[in-house]
């Protein structure tokens, strides 16, 4: 176990050479290629060891202490922690759509950790994001929990020279939930509806939409990287209406973080969620099962697509919108397939 | 903003809501106006009025419409400003319903009979309903809340529907509907300002909605603009920007007491029944979800630019609450 300490001291990414992680990853990769060889007991044992390792690594990297500093919390007593947790989501200064920059920066270290150490996201084509002005980022959606939105946001914030703020449109059901609704809102999410998107684009913001929506994050593992229908063409209609370029983005790696074996709508209804996920780890391992698998991610940002200005009558032309939407879907699908061709391993960067 | 023609035959219904009170004072102070009429059950209590002609009338009595029409004809009324929609939820929803819905219907029939040319209504943005399905800024064309649980909101939606019907039936009457955000200021007294008079304010655990306010001075200015100008249609009258509820409570120096929504609704309802809470449990949705309205149309069409943003309006209220608390302590 002496290795753990050396792990953190080594360069970024190299701690993935650890024995348990490698074993776990190989096990999963074997399972991905041949589902019949699935041995839940072995995987469970490996997963537990992995979580223990992860806890130590987290401690070593110092994410938690960084976050604590960000929140300026003192010695954690039970009451103090509760108070902090309640005050965590209380904002001083929010913009017109509820984004709280201070809060955003205080939880950013966690997502930075995911970005650089956990998912080891490599980003290409960042120069395709304009330095200023409105643009609509359209990406494929996957992975049960929307980590892909967070990673695209971090990618643009960390790697783009203008450090642009990305806002994203979130499905309404999120805003029914306590805490989750505020959390999403304070880090830049707004409810996905044409009114909000139009208003944001008109004030020259950069916004992300995932036209696959719930269908995207709830696709079964066997359907991975097969892009679903792009809603009802809302994204393209919006681009036409507000004359904003669409920037296609392909995310590879997010599909495998929570391999969805089965989804239950019966269990989901009383909980008020769109589907109840069943993965190799969830709900079997309880809350631990909600930890995403450490896959290696690639985000490719494509060339902007601009649309000619058209009359208001043509905006209502369903056939035109549908055709353009399908074209966009094919573009992103092609980008995803090309990235998949280049990828040699689900978990390792080499 | 004032043309001499429009100032004749001005009738205000409702002298005891915040907008009614402020409007009457502004009209009294306006040198262009020689005379105006006020209809209510009781005469206004604040200040002395020389130009004001008070007409005592109960809008909910049987045949109130015929009586009102007669009066309006008699005084040669041209414009009617309807400020009688309540600011606060009532402990007697039956009476409130009679006043808000039946009273409005009576006013509308009298308007038609007396052939008035202009009708201004003070409504509220609460009619859109609070819901996670609302866009962040609701425009005037959005549908009204379909089945509001609260009597307070349901009556207002009902009254607005009657007014919308009038708009399409009688094109000769210019109807302006002003939907105000939460009105705050040193003189405002409503369920929200009442909330701040308590040291501990219960909130919903896990929810922190963005609230929008309009200062009472801005609100009455918008009302005057609509009364003297020709702006038919529906307008949201709101301050710029939003503030989170938790921030508002901290600025006012209140203790935020989060309660799980499951318990909060019955808990607040019981407090309301005992007259401790300033609002019934059913209004809690307005402290849970979004109901922020878009003021763009009023800015463009009416050229209405509020002096106070939502935050400034709220801080003005918070300041006054603190002053009052201090003088109580003395």
Sequence positions of predicted segments:
Chain A
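Soluble catalytic domains of membrane acyltransferases
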Residues: 3, 13, 116-300, 304-306, ...
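Basic, polyanion-binding surface patches
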Residues: 6
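Membrane-anchoring hydrophobic helices of lipid-metabolizing enzymes
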Residues: 11-155, 161-166, 170-188, 192-195, ...
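C-terminal terminal-subdomain/extension
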Residues: 292-350
